[in-house]
Amino acid sequence: MTNANNMARYGVGFDYRDGEGQDWIGSWHRPDISSPNGERHGSSGVCLTSDGDIVLVGGDNIPWEFPDGRPEGEEDWWATLEGEVFEVSCSSVEEATLRGFIRIECVRLPQKGLVRIRSLWEAMVSVHPWVPQHEITRRLVVPSYEALERVEFGRVLGPIYRRWFHEATGYVDTNPL
């Protein structure tokens, strides 16, 4: 669930350090304007089943997360979403709505100035038999109210993920974090 007081607002940046020690500023961007400038870094989906449950994926050393992936060649945002959701969760995207973008900019060497953009979607999916591939070795289908409790997205970028989850599901938690 999400807390209205802890959701990202348009264009407001959040400082964070990634697992490789790089310092970044991440921000939420609305879908009703063109995507922010930067390197296309993939698509992610809050994937809902016809029952309203949510598909999560993970690996041996990968915590639960929403299905996502990077583009191959010149794929557009939609093609990346569709292909990666199938590859990592064995689910077919039936329809999808763009809910926003996350923009991250590296603010310290050696990658200072690098800007990456990821599209964030709400996707209605059909779940197929599980055939794990690559680094994704686990899939879990959970009620929507459990999804954010299981996904590890870090405290700093949490407001962006909560905004995306709210935009995709409509859930708002009135309890503070």
Regions found by a protein language model. Give the residues of each.
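Conserved Nudix-box catalytic region and its N-terminal flanking loop in Nudix hydrolases
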Residues: 48-91
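Class I (Rossmann-like) S-adenosyl-L-methionine-dependent methyltransferase catalytic domain
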Residues: 26-29, 34-35, 105-108, 115, ...
